[in-house]
A protein has these predicted regions:
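PLP-dependent amino-acid enzyme catalytic core
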Residues: 1-183
Length: 183
């Protein structure tokens, strides 16, 4: 069992008429694919309803995380000195917020991606090739991810916000590995 009893209770005992808990057979990547498919095809929803995600695919969460970087950096002496952050990450959301904070002028010396055996981000940063590998279950299940959704947001920025180029890259990724030019 990958979910502790405490985690199970946190997920299943939330009270509220608008909250519906679902369990799936699969891993984080499988669940994330279902969520993305639901956002792409909302025909199952009544016309007056919409879907909202509170995980890192929601832009509002990324914006809130940017604030954490500024707060921590100021506490560490910024802007008079540069700061570095080491961030455990699987889905790239929190570290992407750090990247955006640096783009906004925060004096970030470096952002360090901390990962586990499911090291998709380490591999892409080291080889400029984005490819899937089999998922390995570890003691850090929130990092047990083979496709980092928010990495696509970084690519969008690095490719000068060219949505067509990113759509083509991600379509190619659906079929296999992708390699990046100098960006």
């Amino acid at each position: 069992q990958r979910v502790s009893d405490v985690q199970r209770r946190q997920m299943t005992t939330v009270a509220g008429g608008q909250i519906h808990n679902l369990a799936i057979e699969g891993n984080f990547d499988d669940c994330q694919a279902m969520v993305k498919a639901s956002f792409a095809d909302t025909s199952f929803l009544p016309a007056d309803r919409s879907l909202v995600a509170v995980n890192s695919i929601n832009w509002a969460r990324i914006m809130a995380q940017i604030v954490y970087y500024f707060y921590a950096a100021v506490a560490l002496g910024a802007p008079q000195r540069k700061v570095a952050f080491s961030v455990p990450t699987g889905n790239f959301g929190d570290i992407f917020a750090g990247y955006l904070a640096s783009q906004m002028g925060l004096p970030v010396d470096r952002l360090i991606i901390a990962t586990n055996r499911n090291d998709v981000l380490h591999r892409v940063m080291s080889t400029s090739t984005y490819h899937r590998q089999s998922l390995e279950h570890t003691l850090s299940p929130s990092m047990d991810i083979t496709v980092s959704s928010n990495f696509e947001r970084l690519l969008f920025d690095l490719y000068d916000r060219d949505g067509g180029a990113i759509a083509e890259l991600m379509s190619n990724f659906d079929e296999g590995d992708i390699s990046f030019s100098e960006h």
